[in-house]
Amino acid sequence: MGLFNISLLLTCLMVLAIFHSCEAQNSPQDYLAVHNDARAQVGVGPMSWDANLASRAQNYANSRAGDCNLIHSGAGENLAKGGGDFTGRAAVQLWVSERPDYNYATNQCVGGKMCGHYTQVVWRNSVRLGCGRARCNNGWWFISCNYDPVGNWVGERPY
């Protein structure tokens, strides 16, 4: 009986550790840290967390859970989706990975590549951030981050 209890306890601890490691990548600080690191690299000030934006982002992520399609809501936002343990941190890193595809001198994406997620991350006038994450019906994760003030205005440089 004692061995069974120890096995059960170890199993519970492993499940909690896995859950914690997954959730540990989705806190407001996780979203902010990657945003603010990217912003600091180009001399842009840090963002702060906004609970109202986070609530809107979470509501929108929840509404997309049925199909997991990356359809914009019309708010100033970045969207991402991924399988497995796709985290908020991973989503922001994905957006920041577009940096080499942005040419500051021409204020354009290089070679027709996508770079608008990156420019929103570093948009100098966007100073508040709120993000949400929802599990889609297909098992993937849908992540939405909202920015205020809205950025990514055509023809304007992000910083």
Curated annotation (Swiss-Prot):
Which keywords belong to this entry? Disulfide bond, Pathogenesis-related protein, Plant defense, Pyrrolidone carboxylic acid, Signal
GO terms classed as biological process? defense response; sexual reproduction
- Record-linked InterPro entries: Allrgn_V5/Tpx1_CS (IPR018244), CAP_dom (IPR014044), CAP_sf (IPR035940), CRISP-related (IPR001283)
Keyword Signal attributed: yes
Show which residues constitute the signal peptide: 1-24
Q: Pinpoint the SCP domain residues.
A: 32-147
Per the record, the similarity remark reads: Belongs to the CRISP family.
Designated name of the protein:
Pathogenesis-related leaf protein 4
